[in-house]
């Protein structure tokens, strides 16, 4: 997030207090299989440590400072810290399988939407958790992103706002997909969201909530 240390419990609580419709977070597997909440695959940018998450145990990750004294959280802690619906982005099939276990154990189908840049990860979580809402995320894409989303059973496409065109929006609508734009942090980007009549947008700044429907 833009106002709190990103992907920390502090940031998620702030997003909930700001009244966001949905909180987006990113999941990675630690060396010992914990679902760790962090955007990057490495800890370097957002903590005082270095190296890949996948090469560190949960205990090692817990020892890091994620900003303002915050610790790297696991997914279950976020579930307990906020009541806001969540969108959990997974990076691969292995994470899909780990997340599926948590979703079944805690009956999260109605509360958690699952997204990924990886088609096979979306397909896997759809297979493992019947009824789960899924989204295919894309940064560099063409109209084929709509066909890819339909093929893996996604209900939503989350698309880089800088590359979004009316042609893609119309194709997505014709295919029955919802469309979320990211990352929307400026008034110009907000105007584009409204002009294209998107279903929502992802932002780093919860205060922008007063001007539209947003996730953080």
What does each model-identified segment do?
Residues 1-216:
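Phosphate-group recognition and catalysis centered on beta-loop-alpha active-site segments
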């Amino acid at each position: 997030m833009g106002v709190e240390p990103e992907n920390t419990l502090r940031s998620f609580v702030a997003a909930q207090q700001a009244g966001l419709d949905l909180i987006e977070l990113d999941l990675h597997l630690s060396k010992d299989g914990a679902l760790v909440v962090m955007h990057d695959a490495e800890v370097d940018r957002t903590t005082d440590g270095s190296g890949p998450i996948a090469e560190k145990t949960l205990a090692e990750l817990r020892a890091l400072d994620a900003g303002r004294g915050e610790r790297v959280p696991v997914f279950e802690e976020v579930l307990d810290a906020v009541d806001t619906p969540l969108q959990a982005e997974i990076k691969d099939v292995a994470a899909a399988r780990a997340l599926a276990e948590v979703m079944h154990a805690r009956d999260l189908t109605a509360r958690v939407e699952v997204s990924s840049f990886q088609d096979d990860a979306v397909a896997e979580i759809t297979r493992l958790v019947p009824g789960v809402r899924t989204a295919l995320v894309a940064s560099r894409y063409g109209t084929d992103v709509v066909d890819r989303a339909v093929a893996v059973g996604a209900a939503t496409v989350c698309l880089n706002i800088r590359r979004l065109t009316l042609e893609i929006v119309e194709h997505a609508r014709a295919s029955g997909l919802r469309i979320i734009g990211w990352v929307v942090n400026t008034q110009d980007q907000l105007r584009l969201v409204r002009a294209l009549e998107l279903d929502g947008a992802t932002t780093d700044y919860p205060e922008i909530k007063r001007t539209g429907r947003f996730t953080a």
